[in-house]
Structure formats: C-alpha cells, structure tokens
Amino acid sequence: MNSSSAPNSYWNQKPVLSSGQKPSGIRDSRPKEDDYGVLDAKTFDAIEADELFDSVNHAITHAGQSVLYRSLARPETDAALIQKKQEAVRELASNSMLREALQHFVDTMKEGEQSLYHLLYGTFTGGIAVDNSRGGKDEMEFSGYGYHQFIDGTGFAIDMVETMEILPQPQSAYLRELFQAVRDFGKSRIYSLLRGPVYVSEGKFKTREEKPRYLPLSRFTPSMFKPIPVFFAVAALGAALYFFQGLLASFGIAYLGYGILVLAVPILPVVLIAIAASDRDTVIYPLRKLFKHSPELARLVDVLGMLDELLSFHRYSVAFGGKMTLPEISERERHALEVTEARNPVLARANSNYVPNDVSLDEAGRLLVITGPNSGGKTAYCKTVVQFQLLGQIGCYIPAAVGRLVLAEHIFYQVPDPGHLDEGMGRFGHELKRTREIFFNSTPRSLVVLDELSEGTTFEEKMELSEYVLAGFYKLGASTLLVTHNHELCERLQDKGIGRYLQGEFSPQGPTYRLIPGVSRVSHADRVAAALGFSKEDVEKHLASRS
C-alpha cells in the first residue's frame, strides 16, 4: 500500500489487528508501566480513562472500539492530524447523505469482520461437518477444514474494497485519505491473494498476475469437492470394475465385481478428507499466517476502525445531551486549555442538572490552585480538565459551549497512593518519588494535576517542599493544577505573585459544585462526617450503646 496516501503519523501506532495466535482485545493498548508517551499507566488509571471510554464509545465494530480505546490510551501530539480529524467529524455532522452511507458501510463490514477473525485465528479440527463463521459463534474452534472461514474471511476484505468504490466521495482530507487507503489496498499483492485465485508452486503462493501464462500450476479451490480428483477416482474405479468384470467373468463369478465396487466406494471420501487436510495444513494455515503479518491488511482493519471511530464521535455528541463542541486546536510553545461551561464527560452523561464550570489555563494562570472542603467538586473538576484535554486531543467533541486547547506532550495526574508503597519507603517518600518523576518529565507543553502534595510529613516540611515544587512547575511553564486544603500554602504563593485560585462554593444547603475565585479557609469536615454517620455525636452514641 502506498502509505503516503494515508495519515502517515497515525500509522506509527501499533495496529489493532493482532499478528499472534489470538485476536487482540479492545483494551490491549492501555499504557504499560514502562510506557512514557502522553499518558503513563498511573495517570491513565487516575483519570478514569476506562470510564471515559465507556461514556464516549458508540463504535459498533471490534476494530472501531479498539481504535477508539487506542486513541485515548495513546493520544496524538500532531496538531495537523487532529485538525483533519475534526474537519472529518464536522463533515459527517453536516452531510447526512455521506454519514448515512458510511454508517451503512460500517454496518455491513461489521457482519464480515468476525469472519476475518475466524479465518485468521480459528482452529479447524477436521471432519465432515462444518461450522460456518457467519453463524455468530464467539469460539475460535471449528469442525471442518477452514473452507467456509476462508471464503467468508477473504470476502470481508473483498467487500470492503468493492463497496468503497460506490460510496459518496468526501471533501475532508482525513476521510479522503482513508478512502484512498482502501483503494490502495485493492492494488496490493495481499489483496490479490485474498481475492484469488491462488496458485501453489513448490510451497509458495502466486497470484493470477504472478502466474506464468503457459505454466500449469495447482490452483487452490476452497471447497472439499475437488472435480479433478473426483474425476480420476471415479475413472479409476470404473477401469477397475471393467477389468475385474472381464477377469471374473472367465471364472463365472462376474457378480463379485459389483461387491468389489461397493467396497471401493468408501475410498473416495477418505481421499477427499486427505486432500482437505492437506489444503488446511499447506494452504489455508500458511496463507493466513501471511495475512496476519501483512501491514496492508492491518491498515485495512485500522481504516475500518478509524471510520467507525469518527461515526462514534458523532453519535456521542448526539446522545450525550446539552451543549457539545469541537475545541479549537492551537499550536503554541506552551500548553493552554480554555473551556466555557465544561461538564464532566462521565458524570454529566444524561444528567441535565450537572453544574458546569469554566476552565482557564493560559499564560497568566498556568498554575491553578483549588481549595475547599471535601465533596465540593475539586477532584471532579480536575478530572474534567484532564478528560477534556484527552477528548480534544483525539479529535472528539467535549461537553461544553466553547473550547480551545494546545495539544499536550505529556499529561500527568498524581493522587495519594498509600496502597502501593515501594520497599523500604514510606508514604512520603513514595509520593515524593512520583512527584519527582512527573517534574523531570514535564515540559512547557505538559498538563499536570497534583491531588494533594507532600503528604506524610510534618506541616512545616510540607509547606516548604510544596512551595518550591510548585514554584518549580511554574518556572518550568507546565499547566499545573493543585488540589489542597492548605490555605497557608496559597498565601505564600500569592505573596510571590504565583498562581490563580479557585475554591468550592458552598450554600447553607451544601456544596453547589461550582468553583469560584478565591481561597477557602473552611473545612466542613463535620458535615461530611455527619453525612457518613461518623460525627462526634455518632461516636458517642456508639460508645454509650456498648457500655
């Protein structure tokens, strides 16, 4: 395939089509412990990326869901590519004819997608009975020799190439490139092998175009019924019957020839089974190994997933409810994120009463300190910020009125994690190690969230350490959010002219979940304890009842 005709930077991602013994899982692309891309494994878990995927996911194909999950787990940093994806999403929203045609295309391909996986990863156990891969089974073990799976699986690729030719032509560059990628696949050698016929020569496979015109070669027929072997077997039986009829007639026992014929008939299915087993082991299995390791076929499956992903974005924007927007993608040296009326993409789903907040991380306010009592919406706000960054960075809608962002090189989210302590290191050392890791990997185009800082030490040490760490992030230029109950720290930073400050708003009835300017100096810990049934009065009542 001519890779220049597709979004080149996207092909740097690992394909969703597995080259191994089993099909890939939808969530196989989640970051590992040693991954240092835009997201690391700890951040991925802390921001509830799996829940975000569940909220956004409206893809219908396995490839589409895998591509969407991969986009969230390993987001792009190429602003031009994301802008092209947004252009394609806008075209689908405005061009109903194209959207409906593409939706029908993806619906049709979904029916054949599983057939491809059955061919590539199925085990064919032999026997006369066959399991048709269009029967809806999830298992990867089939009786028969793989003929049905070969026909259905290769038919998926053939249908995709042929159907693409009759779709309305898009105007957006991203969609045009994906369409062209399918056409390029139709010109590849691997497509010729999938389409057939396939010729076998000394253990190697040749396409129709590669076969010498006047050289007779064995042609693979994906069927247990083989006309030529059957013809020769029947001819041999007929010749044998003719010979034995004449020979036995001379002894007056010509009737025995028919008995010999009856005994010889079962040889025919034995021969056919042997040929079918040979087809499976010498043609189907080797061919599918070639298919699984084909970058061209992997890209074709990726294209299906990428088209389904775009349609999923559109369906998500319609189903979520309320204001939705595609954020403007800016290219700057420093990270920035500005959103009006932001609603959390997980918590606000189908919740018309969710309280929106504005987000402003710019040059003047790249250090944002959020204070306030527990249950006031501080953590939800921070997760909204990071989840918006992630959705914008994959070309998806965000639940907001207006948005603008710069793609982040790195996104970090630190939360207290006392349950995973390193050997010989207490909570303070463990969390400080994580903060150090974040700091030394951050750049001016990074987004960092610190949910509490320097826990597990004395107040004086916490103040000193937090102050110089936050000043360091500020000088570094990364967009940094700190969640804290420490208003004394805020006062020190304010004295240095560093940071912008928000606090959770509370009414007499409780939290409003709106963040307003200022520094909170109240706790409301008694209110939270009372709501949980663990206030001072609850403790005293329990002790009184025990005595």
What are these language model-derived features?
Residues 23-28, 38-40, 271-272, 278-279, ...:
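Short, flexible segments with low predicted structural confidence
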Residues 1-228, 292-299, 303-306, 325-327, ...:
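Conserved amphipathic alpha-helical "coupling/scaffold" segments
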Residues 260-272, 310-547:
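ATPase nucleotide-binding head domains, primarily ABC-like/P-loop NTPase cores
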Residues 215-285:
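Transmembrane alpha-helical hairpins and terminal membrane-anchor modules
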Residues 273, 287, 291-294, 298-301, ...:
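Short amphipathic alpha-helical segments with heptad-repeat character
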Residues 284-322:
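Transmembrane helical bundles of ABC transporter permease domains
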Residues 31-32, 275-280, 450:
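Short N-terminal helix-initiation segments at or just after the protein's N-terminus
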Residues 2-7, 272-289, 313-319, 395:
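Juxtamembrane/interface segments at transmembrane-helix termini
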